[in-house]
Amino acid sequence: MELNELTEKIIGCAYEVSNVLGSGFPENVYEKALQHQALKTGLIAERQYQMKVFFDDILVGEFFADLLIGQTVLVEVKAVRALDELHVAQAMNYLKASGMPICLLINFGRPKIEIRRFVPYDVWKEQPHFAHHRIR
């Protein structure tokens, strides 16, 4: 499946979760619901996907992305009143460390969900139509 098509399917799943659950639940509720909806639509979706961070070929840390969908799209789920620069930095760092081609930051904490896409610069150069935020 093409990357843009995959992200649109994931976004559709997020809207379905938002339409059914609304806002006000903790993040893990939305994370589980989004995984369920993605699986229901035939996508591969792993929760709490573990990744490692290396510096000079030395393991310096580990982190868990909320979801990895389609084996290529990281999804970071939030349930906050407003996304801030720390949420954006987290999504960008996860994307850089993972080497994945895209990260979706999805906030279910408002009546209308907020979705931001992040892509590495090299992917953005090839497909600029699909980046909201590019990272170098």
Residue locations for each model-derived region?
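Residues at secondary-structure transition points
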Residues: 1, 5, 25, 29, ...
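Solvent-exposed, charged helical/coil patches
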Residues: 1-44, 113, 119-136
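Glycine-rich, flexible loop/turn motifs
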Residues: 17, 21, 25, 56-59, ...
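Conserved catalytic cores of phosphodiester-cleaving nucleases, focusing on short active-site segments
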Residues: 22, 45, 65-83, 94
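Glycine/small-residue-rich phosphate/adenosyl-binding loop
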Residues: 31-66
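Nucleic-acid nuclease catalytic cores
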Residues: 78-125
